[in-house]
């Protein structure tokens, strides 16, 4: 029987958080018991330090809060929770939301447009999410809204703006930029060949380096079998930065399942 560390204190709490149920999403089933225990410890601290704010009638219960916290903490499992110090609130809409977008074109004209967003990450402010896309982040499909927005926060720790280069040693920056831009070019070539909808990697990754880092961070954790063989050099850089190897984790979990299946009597 697994002895979950957070269950030891359950008798002391009238409303124990449902961590074991929260861990049951496909994305987290490949984690070892030790990794799950460590992730829950981080997620507990996350919920103590951050404020989850439901908007427009969205109902936030304990299970939803736990799963949101677990996904926020997965990218920083080995980095530490201090890497998420750049915000204090998470705003959660029930569905994708409309925002006013303003930009300046090449000749200096300012344009305003209302656009639909799945999420936002403000450099000196909250992270904004929506529950429909959070739910779609539970599986291992290559899409993960929370990891995408967390990646932007990790990116901006390196300076004033998101550049696609997280906080790594200076001697690693040139190699990181080279491999990231090579990946962007490769994705763009595929888009030109088969179209955005048929591309094997989200076309948003080709839009700029910051989005490439965020999108590939989604694939790193939720579809490593697509990322690793296609961009092996960049994959190793991601492994070094995040201090995790989700592909090795996936293979180990599959091997364990196969062994268990062959020993069923």
From Swiss-Prot:
GO terms for molecular function: aminopeptidase activity; metallopeptidase activity; zinc ion binding. Zn(2+) binds at residues 111, 148, 152, 211. GO terms for cellular component: cytosol. It comes from the Bacteria. Pfam families: Peptidase_M90. It is an enzyme of class 3 (hydrolase). Its EC number is 3.4.11.-. It is found in: Cytoplasm. This is Mlc titration factor A. The lineage of its organism: Bacteria, Pseudomonadati, Pseudomonadota, Gammaproteobacteria, Enterobacterales.
